[in-house]
Amino acid sequence: MKRKILIIGNSAKEYAIAKKLSEKHDIFVTPASDAMKEFATCLDIREDASAEILEFVMENDIDLTIPVSIKALKSDIVELFNQNNQTIFAPVKNACKLMFDKALAKKILYKLRIPTPKFGIFEKQNMAMDYIKNLKNPFVIKTDDSNSATVFTNTQTAKTFIDSLFIEKNKRVIIEDYIYGTPFSFYTITDGYKALPIGSSITYKHSLEGDGGQLTSGMGACSPNYKLTLEQEYYLMDNVIYPTLDYCEIEGNPYLGILGVNGILTEDGRIFVLGWQSFMQDCDATAVLEVLDEDLYELFKSCVVGSFSDEIEGINLYNKYASSLVLTCKNKVNAENAILGLDNLDEETKITFYPSVNKNKYLEFEAEYGANIILTTSGVTASKAVDKMYLEAEDIEFKGKSFRRDICKFKI
C-alpha cells in the first residue's frame, strides 16, 4: 500500500532518501530543489515553519514526516507533531544538540570516555593563540556551530584564521589534534532504547587527491566500509552508540531516529570519534541507502509507534558494495552550462542532485559553481563498484567538471 511521506530539506541527502522512498510511496518535499520535481510533489514551505508544516500534514493525511535538514531539526517540529499525534521520525530538538553544538559534543565525548582527538575549547582569542603555540602540526580548527573544519600545518596561518573567527563574532573556537587514518561513518537506527546498525561508509572529505586541499562536506564515499571489522562495529555499538542513547535518556531527551558517528580508523585499528550525525551525509547517503534492503517506511514507522524493539531483530543488507563520487564545477561563470550525458548512463546508476542544480529553458539540468552531482554505482566487490563509477563519470559532461580520481583507489 502506497503511503504519503513528507521529507523536510532540499540538499543531496534529502534527495537521496526521497528518491529511495519514491520507489514505493508518494513523496512530498519542502522546500524542495528543482531536480526533485521528477519524482516528488514539491512544496514551498520554510523548513523551520513548524506550524505551517503541521497544518499541511493534517489537511493532506500525511502518513509519515521525516525532518532531515539542520534548520528543521533545530525547530520545535518534533515536539509539535508529538503533541498533535502526528507520526514523525526524528530526534527532539534537545537531543540534536549533540550534532549542532560542537563544543558540547566534545565535552560529552570526554564525559562518556569515548576516544576523541585531544582538544581545547576557547571563548577568548588570546587563550586560543597560546594553545596552538605548543601544538604539533597538523591540527584542526572549527567553530562551535559549523560543520566545516580547517586543517593547519602552519601556526602563523592558524593565528590569522583565529583572528578572523573572533572578528566574525564566533563565540567559541574548537582546536583539536589531527588524527591520521581513514575517515568513516557508522549509522544506526534507534527508537531511543534499542539500536541496530543500518550501514557504514568510508568518506573522503579533502577536496584534492591524496587527501590534499581543504576539508569539505565530502567528495566521495564507499559503503559498506570494508575496513571496519565486525569487532569494531560491536565496539562502536557498545562504547559509543549505547552510551550516547543512555546519556540522552538520562537528560530527558530520548533519541529517536538515525544516529550516526563520524570518526577516524587508524592503521593500528584504533577508533577516534569526531562527532555525531543526525542523518546520513550528502556524500554517502545514496551509497548507504543503495545497500540497504528494507522498506524504509515500515522501518522508520516501527520506531515511532513503539514496535521496533519487539519486531525488528536485524537490518537486511544487499550483498554488494556501492561507491559515490561528487562531481563539482570549478567555473565561476554565469553562462549556460548544461549537464550532458545523463541519458547515456547505465539504468542501475544512481544520480543525486545538489539543490544548486536547476533546469534551463530547454529542460536541461545546468551545473553551477561548487558541488552538483553525486554519481553512485554498485558491484559485487568494492573495486567493481569503483571501476564502474569512474567509467560512468566520464560520460557526464559540463564545463568545469571536476572530481577526485582516487576514491577507494587503494588496495582492497
How should each PLM-predicted stretch be described?
Residues 1-93:
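ATP-binding N-terminal substructure of ATP-dependent carboxylate-amine bond-forming enzymes
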Residues 89-150, 156:
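A conserved helix-loop-beta module that forms one wall/lid of the active-site cleft
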Residues 144, 317-319, 365-370:
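Short, flexible turn/loop "capping" segments at secondary-structure junctions
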Residues 149-286:
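Internal nucleotide-binding/catalytic subdomain
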Residues 153-155, 188-190, 327-329, 375-379:
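Short beta-strand-to-loop capping motifs
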Residues 237-260, 277-349, 358:
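Active-site "cap" helix and flanking loop/linker of ATP-utilizing ligase/carboxylase catalytic domains
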Residues 358-362, 366-412:
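Generic C-terminus detector
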